[in-house]
């Protein structure tokens, strides 16, 4: 698998979740922020990152930088969907991803929807099973998308001619 250069792609970012974290110290509470960000070019490349900082914009910037280092390629077939059904796991979170016919749209919960839209999937069904924490859902959706192989890749692996 070759390295993906994020500078060659026209990436857009979506903030999935921002959380305020409190550290209790002697004088009171110190607040910092973490931002879960998904980036994608809308044509098969997608990545996620978690940024942490004392200010929200800085946390988002760090999340985008990390997401660019964590890009994967998603095989998209005709009808702008995935080739077959897959189940992604992360911790207690599971995401079932199914291909859909043209015109269906993205039917997915908030965190998973951001991943699919950033990847450029326009017709896909998904269901979050188990944990619906945004961090677990995004990582489980990524696990599912990582498992996908294009039909050509599967045929080559099986030694079948096109």
Swiss-Prot record:
PROSITE patterns: RIBOSOMAL_S5 (PS00585), S5_DSRBD (PS50881)
Superkingdom of the source species: Bacteria
Domain spans labelled S5 DRBM: 11-74
GO cellular component: small ribosomal subunit
A Gene Ontology molecular function term of the record: rRNA binding
Entries under NCBIfam families matching the protein: rpsE_bact
Family the UniProt entry places it in: Belongs to the universal ribosomal protein uS5 family.
Subunit record text: Part of the 30S ribosomal subunit. Contacts proteins S4 and S8.
Name by which UniProt lists this protein: Small ribosomal subunit protein uS5
């Amino acid at each position: 698998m070759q390295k993906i250069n994020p500078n060659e792609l026209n990436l857009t970012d979506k903030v999935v979740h921002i959380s305020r974290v409190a550290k209790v110290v002697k004088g009171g509470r110190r607040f910092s922020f973490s931002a879960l960000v998904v980036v994608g070019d809308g044509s098969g490349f997608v990545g996620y990152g978690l940024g942490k900082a004392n200010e929200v914009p800085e946390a988002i910037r760090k999340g985008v930088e990390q997401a660019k280092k964590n890009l994967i390629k998603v095989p998209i077939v005709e009808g702008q969907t995935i080739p077959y059904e897959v189940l992604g796991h992360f911790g207690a979170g599971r995401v079932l991803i199914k291909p859909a016919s043209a015109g269906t749209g993205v039917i997915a919960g908030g965190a998973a929807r951001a991943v699919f839209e950033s990847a450029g999937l326009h017709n896909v069904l998904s269901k979050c099973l188990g944990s619906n924490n945004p961090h677990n859902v995004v990582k489980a959706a990524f696990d599912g998308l990582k498992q996908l192989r294009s039909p050509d890749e599967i045929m080559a692996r099986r030694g079948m001619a096109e």
